[in-house]
């Protein structure tokens, strides 16, 4: 019966590539062959951020990756957390980011979560937690509703926009621990750096980070 339901579901809702939305063929899973060959993976060890020990991104933030992440965040694309999270877990393993005791995420404001219906970074973090077998918890809270970073240009302005926006929760779960911080998109890195600073101030031993995609260029 379960197999029959599976076939009916695939007939009515054929699986599509998470990047280009084209129909998947044969043994293709999540990403079509064309997107796998044409989408640039982000190189290992290229990202450097203040307050963060190591950072890894699955892809460059451009083309179909950019469009797909826009669906994820703004067009009820919460289902994309599953394939994204699995890819992020594999990336974290390949880049040795998994020697941590806790996984957490960059939180959105309560207002934005209410409007969107979900916190996309929390969904990613929980998939990564399940895949890696590492506990996941809410260690940060957004205490001020600031301007969206996407509407601000320049690292200095973005950095100023996030100062004092985040607060550490449960210091006893943070102190002395190595933490993997999860975010969806990295541009200048200002938000991730501020979240890492807050975690370190609360006593974290080390903060690593993994993101779906990055448009980041290292800042001096």
Over which residues does each language-model region extend?
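Glycine-rich phosphate/pyrophosphate-handling loop used in enzymes and phosphotransfer proteins
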Residues: 1-183, 187-220
